[in-house]
Amino acid sequence: MESKRSSSSPLLILITTIMIIFIISGPKSVDADCKHPVGPYTDSCFTDCVSGKYGYNYESAFCSRDETGTCKICCCELINE
């Protein structure tokens, strides 16, 4: 008795491959509005913002990214602004 091997449809394989590539590469995210850019991004961006280095005790910080996803600008922020 010969067993037939089930073959996946080429379309299913193509869709799965595209989904895997999308998940690995990640979607291009749009950064939040940077209302308080304070300079180039550094590892101490968050600490500098919340410690008052820039003249105000901000509540949080994030980096604004370029089109390649690299952090470029340190953005301090007030949560309820």
Swiss-Prot record:
Disulfide bonds: C34-C63, C45-C74, C49-C76
Localization, UniProt: Secreted
Cellular component, GO, one term: extracellular region
Record flagged with keyword Secreted: yes
One GO BP annotation of this record: killing of cells of another organism
Signal peptide extent: 1-32
Subcellular location, principal: secreted
Top-rank taxon, per record: Eukaryota
Keywords recorded for this protein, A-Z: Antimicrobial, Disulfide bond, Fungicide, Plant defense, Secreted, Signal
Family, similarity comment: Belongs to the DEFL family.
Name of the featured protein: Defensin-like protein 313
